[in-house]
Amino acid sequence: MDDKTSKAAAAEKAKALAAALSQIEKQFGKGSIMRYGDNEVEHDIQVVSTGSLGLDIALGVGGLPRGRVIEVYGPESSGKTTLTLQVIAEMQKLGGTCAFVDAEHALDVQYASKLGVNLTDLLISQPDTGEQALEITDALVRSGSVDLIVIDSVAALVPKAEIEGEMGDSLPGLQARLMSQALRKLTATIKRTNCMVIFINQIRMKIGVMFGNPETTTGGNALKFYSSVRLDIRRIGAIKKGDEVVGNETRVKVVKNKVAPPFKQAEFDIMYGSGISREGEIIDLGVQANVVDKSGAWYSYSGNRIGQGKDNVREYLKEHKEMAIEIENKVRENQGIVSRAATFPASEAEDGE
């Protein structure tokens, strides 16, 4: 009898939980709650590669989701702008229209071009005030013809009142209110037009924090709530050739993820002048997935040796792009995420061209 009662009680609890989960999803949207162990993923969303295979895997869906707000934050020179420029390059390859709202007035167009960004088709705005930047963003989203907008950065979205005021004026909470109002307006339109909006953010230190993390991001709390994906990007080391530093070792942590389980991380190399070393990642992840065989210093693929030492294999894959994409798609298949060639429906990619 006790066993039957406990089973009935467990069934009731499970039923009540299912009803609560259904109510939460109805109220707050799909993906607002999920069982971590189920590894449930929204498969009907369109994604765009980040330019990093490891990060695409860590995101759980093969890239950044369209029709969502994304936040990328980290310390100075950690690779925030590089990562977003790589996403722009990937979106342009798929025929998408991209805009860069340069509130910091610091975009290096030569560097963007080296990362594969098509500057001819890129829309660039350098607004004078935070209100102007967010109004431009709103107009672009509402047009329904822009696929990706990057705002660099939240810290540089200075309210008009602050610009027109005196240098020592205290205007607490002005930027936070501006961000909160803008995101309330933007969110529904972003979802409807399937436009991805990436906010780059900076880190500040809270004063007087004795315990816990003293770091916080600028612009108040609104962006934390409205973001579907939040990425914390850090420089963890230098890549050297002899005594010369030629790149950064970078770690990205998925701090928040509404489309797949969060808290995963990826490590990759950002090479100066060329961006994320995709070939280096393909080699490492290919070996992990047993797609590429490693014996001593030699690497082999499909029974054929492709080079001795990682640097030589990296150069080989740069010259043989078809093989690199083939290995990458096998790794993606192994991880159960969308292949790079099939990130968009073909008809949509053609329409955008």
UniProtKB/Swiss-Prot annotation:
Alphabetical list of SUPFAM superfamilies matching this protein: P-loop containing nucleoside triphosphate hydrolases (SSF52540), RecA protein, C-terminal domain (SSF54752)
Keyword flag Iron-sulfur: no
Subcellular location: Cytoplasm
InterPro entries: AAA+_ATPase, DNA_recomb/repair_RecA, DNA_recomb/repair_RecA_CS, P-loop_NTPase, RecA-like_C, RecA-like_N, RecA_ATP-bd, RecA_C_sf
PROSITE patterns: RECA_1, RECA_2, RECA_3
Principal location: cytoplasm
Residues at which ATP binds: 74-81
Keywords: ATP-binding, Cytoplasm, DNA damage, DNA recombination, DNA repair, DNA-binding, Nucleotide-binding, SOS response
GO biological process assignments: DNA recombination; DNA repair; SOS response
Keyword DNA damage: yes
Tree of life domain: Bacteria
Gene Ontology molecular function: ATP binding; ATP hydrolysis activity; ATP-dependent DNA damage sensor activity; damaged DNA binding; single-stranded DNA binding
Pfam name, any one: RecA_C
GO annotation, cellular component aspect: cytosol
Family listed: Belongs to the RecA family.
Function of the protein: Can catalyze the hydrolysis of ATP in the presence of single-stranded DNA, the ATP-dependent uptake of single-stranded DNA by duplex DNA, and the ATP-dependent hybridization of homologous single-stranded DNAs. It interacts with LexA causing its activation and leading to its autocatalytic cleavage.
PANTHER family referenced in this protein's UniProt entry, alphabetically: MITOCHONDRIAL DNA REPAIR PROTEIN RECA HOMOLOG-RELATED (PTHR45900:SF1), RECA (PTHR45900)
Protein name, as recorded: Protein RecA
Species name: Bordetella pertussis (strain Tohama I / ATCC BAA-589 / NCTC 13251)
The organism's taxonomic lineage, starting at the top: Bacteria, Pseudomonadati, Pseudomonadota, Betaproteobacteria, Burkholderiales
